Amino acid sequence: MRITQGCFSFLPDLTDEQITAQVEYCLGRGWAIGVEYTDDPHPRNTYWEMWGNPMFDLRDAKGVMMEVEDCRKAHPQDYIRLNAFDSSRGLETVTMSFIVNRPENEPSLRMTRTESDGRSQHYTWETQR
């Protein structure tokens, strides 16, 4: 099952040239870039592992792509995403986020429904490999 999180998630995987173009777009607007990775793509898992610190002072897309490549080498079977942060309002707000690496075999999600008091329905999601 293809995980659909962030911008461009319903499109085919971006090439490195397309990723570079998106990074240049972000840097051109003064947004900082951060690289994150995870092996658990559950929709409620919003806290991915950071790959280094966000690159607040970087103005060159090549530096971001070097970090992406290093993260890909260290975590080839994990999800890797780029986050762009906009601080123009005095807050570091995620303005853009998209996946740049996926494992060869993506896990699927299984939903379990249980009935409780008053016929209330409760749902549980599990990641299956």
Swiss-Prot record:
Entries under CDD domains matching the protein: RuBisCO_small
Record-linked InterPro entries: RuBisCO_ssu, RuBisCO_ssu_dom, RuBisCO_ssu_sf
Alphabetized GO MF terms: ribulose-bisphosphate carboxylase activity
Chloroplast keyword on record: no
Superkingdom of origin organism: Bacteria
Keyword Cell inner membrane found: no
Start and end residues of each stretch annotated as Disordered: 104-129
Pfam families for the chain: RuBisCO_small (PF00101)
Compositional bias segments (type: Basic and acidic residues): 104-120
GO process annotations (BP): reductive pentose-phosphate cycle
Entry keyword set: Calvin cycle, Carbon dioxide fixation, Plasmid
Remarks, miscellaneous: The basic functional RuBisCO is composed of a large chain homodimer in a 'head-to-tail' conformation. In form I RuBisCO this homodimer is arranged in a barrel-like tetramer with the small subunits forming a tetrameric 'cap' on each end of the 'barrel'.
Subunit structure: Heterohexadecamer of 8 large and 8 small subunits.
Function (record text): RuBisCO catalyzes two reactions: the carboxylation of D-ribulose 1,5-bisphosphate, the primary event in carbon dioxide fixation, as well as the oxidative fragmentation of the pentose substrate. Both reactions occur simultaneously and in competition at the same active site. Although the small subunit is not catalytic it is essential for maximal activity.
Family membership noted in the UniProt record: Belongs to the RuBisCO small chain family.
Record-given protein name: Ribulose bisphosphate carboxylase small subunit
The organism of origin for this protein: Sinorhizobium medicae (strain WSM419) (Ensifer medicae)
